[in-house]
């Protein structure tokens, strides 16, 4: 669930061995290893699952055009998670030119997982002391999360909270909508239930940009309005791309990338129930912003101007209202 990249800055070839522990407590899926690539056009890494993946891919392309729901199937497919979204949608989400969005989908990239960097990477690294201080602060926060045995007894725990109040919003965009979250930090009883919740309100055409749950499965329930939900798996296939309305449920597996957009006629309001009392979310936009410019340029084959556009113009938070220039592309 945590995005990372590796660069060999030495003079010799590097052989790295990765151990994937699918039985760890954070994994809420099955024991099948899955690798989610944000960029490139990677090959299948686990041959034992390739036959199953090909079968799903054939089933997807055998559907009638009218049942596919979105536009991404009309474009050439890649194997990264962003290839499951259409270029038009990515251009709207990241507020970029359509050419940049097409490169993000990496449909014709023949480099697979490994990219050769000409001239080396120029990266600003944080000082070691800063990293140590951050680790100490995280350890302190973890130690303070234990129950104190006094105010956090079962009998005295608060059991109700209204996360739909506008003033309660954790994230807000006056043109796109708002997001409110309830977890064991704001409602401690959720620790015993191992659940958390998220309330999302999207205005007309508002977008909750592509994101994924690092440590939880989620259940999306529409309470008002209508819109579209897109879900992409580890092979870059859109496993769900359809309109949703009041009363409908959608299950989003852990680490699957999902994006929601409200309709043109009315907004979209929904609740998301998550199977972890402190569910963590990663947003593709924030990942791009935190990734060094040279890494993005080499990974996606972007020019410097496009990297700047992607890191700055398209990263104003996970709630987005499509710009007129993106809509006209």
UniProtKB/Swiss-Prot annotation:
Residues 99-112 have a biased composition (Basic and acidic residues). It comes from the Eukaryota. Residues 161-308 form the Cupin type-1 domain. Residues 129-138 have a biased composition (Acidic residues). One of its GO terms (molecular function) is nutrient reservoir activity. CDD domains: cupin_11S_legumin_C. Residues 47-79, 97-149 are annotated as: Disordered. Keywords: Disulfide bond, Seed storage protein, Storage protein. The keyword Membrane does not apply. It holds the Pfam family Cupin_1. Belongs to the 11S seed storage protein (globulins) family. This protein found in the seeds of many leguminous and non-leguminous plants is the source of sulfur-containing amino acids in seed meals. Hexamer; each subunit is composed of an acidic and a basic chain derived from a single precursor and linked by a disulfide bond. This is Legumin type B. The gene is LEB6.
């Amino acid at each position: 669930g945590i995005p990372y990249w590796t660069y060999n800055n030495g003079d010799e070839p590097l052989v790295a061995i990765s151990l994937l522990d699918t039985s760890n407590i954070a994994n809420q899926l099955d024991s099948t290893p899955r690798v989610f690539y944000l960029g490139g056009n990677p090959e299948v890494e686990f041959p034992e699952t390739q036959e199953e993946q090909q079968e799903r891919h054939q089933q997807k392309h055998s559907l009638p055009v009218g049942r596919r729901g979105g536009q991404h199937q009309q474009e050439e497919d890649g194997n990264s998670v962003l290839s499951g979204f259409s270029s038009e949608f990515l251009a709207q989400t990241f507020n970029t030119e359509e050419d940049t969005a097409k490169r993000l989908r990496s449909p014709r990239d023949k480099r697979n997982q490994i990219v050769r960097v000409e001239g080396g990477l120029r990266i600003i690294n944080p000082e070691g002391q800063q990293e140590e201080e951050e680790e100490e602060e995280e350890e302190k926060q973890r130690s303070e999360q234990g129950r104190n045995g006094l105010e956090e007894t079962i009998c005295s725990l608060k059991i109700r909270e209204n996360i739909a109040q506008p003033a309660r919003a954790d994230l807000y965009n006056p043109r796109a909508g708002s997001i409110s979250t309830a977890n064991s930090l704001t409602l401690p009883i959720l620790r015993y239930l191992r659940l958390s919740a998220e309330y999302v309100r999207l205005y007309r055409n508002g977008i909750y940009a592509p994101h994924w749950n690092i440590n939880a499965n989620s259940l999306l329930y529409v309470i008002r309005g209508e819109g579209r939900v897109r879900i992409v798996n580890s092979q870059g296939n859109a496993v769900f791309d359809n309109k949703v309305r009041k009363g409908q449920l959608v299950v989003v597996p852990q680490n699957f990338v999902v994006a929601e957009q409200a309709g043109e006629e009315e907004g979209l309001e929904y609740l998301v129930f998550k199977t972890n009392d402190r569910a963590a979310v990663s947003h593709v936009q924030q990942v791009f912003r935190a990734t060094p410019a040279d890494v993005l340029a080499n990974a996606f084959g972007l020019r410097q101007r496009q990297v700047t556009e992607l890191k700055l113009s398209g990263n104003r938070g996970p709630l987005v209202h499509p710009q007129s220039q993106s809509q006209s592309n």
